[in-house]
Amino acid sequence: MDTAKWPQEFVVKPMNEIVTNTCLKQQSNPPSPATPVERKARPEKDQALNCPRCNSLNTKFCYYNNYSLTQPRYFCKDCRRYWTAGGSLRNIPVGGGVRKNKRSSSNSSSSSPSSSSSSKKPLFANNNTPTPPLPHLNPKIGEAAATKVQDLTFSQGFGNAHEVKDLNLAFSQGFGIGHNHHSSIPEFLQVVPSSSMKNNPLVSTSSSLELLGISSSSASSNSRPAFMSYPNVHDSSVYTASGFGLSYPQFQEFMRPALGFSLDGGDPLRQEEGSSGTNNGRPLLPFESLLKLPVSSSSTNSGGNGNLKENNDEHSDHEHEKEEGEADQSVGFWSGMLSAGASAAASGGSWQ
């Protein structure tokens, strides 16, 4: 078709004609009633079917199996079983009855493992069970074991208690060594019974003084304490009794007192063995460094002239008087021995 012929075939109609034509068509053709949608209703059975198991008429239609019209499914209310028309019968119960049976069976199965587990031995031991008593918790066993260990120790080290005494060791006199473990406690550490302390109130004070080496009679008088004194170091029997002889030079340094200050009487090794033991070996504390001794310039400048020496002497006398005045106000120092004895009084110790 050519494009030149288009205006001739398609004629534009006026608007009024279009409106009038549509109105006339609506009046001539009344609206037809709406047709209902056709549904395929479920086929209702006029009469109930007999149950293939119990021949009961108490049955009902349930649904179509697999949405197929050829497999209607029914349910029997008496035997509570389902069946499908055209299908095979199954003896497996379906529905609520099966669920009830499953619940009862599950309860019975859960109770049986619990009973079997209770009858078996538990895998882990209970922590609350009391542990058997250990031997070291029993005091009798502990004392017997301590006694055996002590006897074994002394028997291995020394062989016998008599051998220890024969060695004349320093601890053989202070500590009792025997088979009884109570005898190894030093006598000055033994506790005084409370009954004796109640009866005699002076027992506690006397025992404490005896611990320090001070007797009750000497404590009343102003005597020096026993623990401040040292044994007579001039006597050579102290060293020979301990198993060390003066003839052994390797023990000479060991026998020297390892103190930071000197003892009264000097070195015992340098004295003669036959010297009388009048000195008690009291310690001398290093108070010499605390004393303020005036230093005169005359000792340093011995070669100076006479005028300078006289001036220095006057200056030193003035400083000495000043120091004596200050010493009267301050605490004095004892230049002698720590404990005043007969030898100390003879040596001329005095307060400064």
From Swiss-Prot:
Main subcellular localisation: nucleus
Keywords: DNA-binding, Metal-binding, Nucleus, Transcription, Transcription regulation, Zinc, Zinc-finger
Protein residues bound to Zn(2+): C51, C54, C76, C79
Chain positions covered by the region annotation Disordered: 24-46, 93-136, 265-334
Subcellular location: Nucleus
Signal peptide span: none
Entries under Pfam families matching the protein: Zn_ribbon_Dof
Protein name: Dof zinc finger protein DOF1.8
Organism for this UniProt entry: Arabidopsis thaliana (Mouse-ear cress)
Gene name of the record: DOF1.8
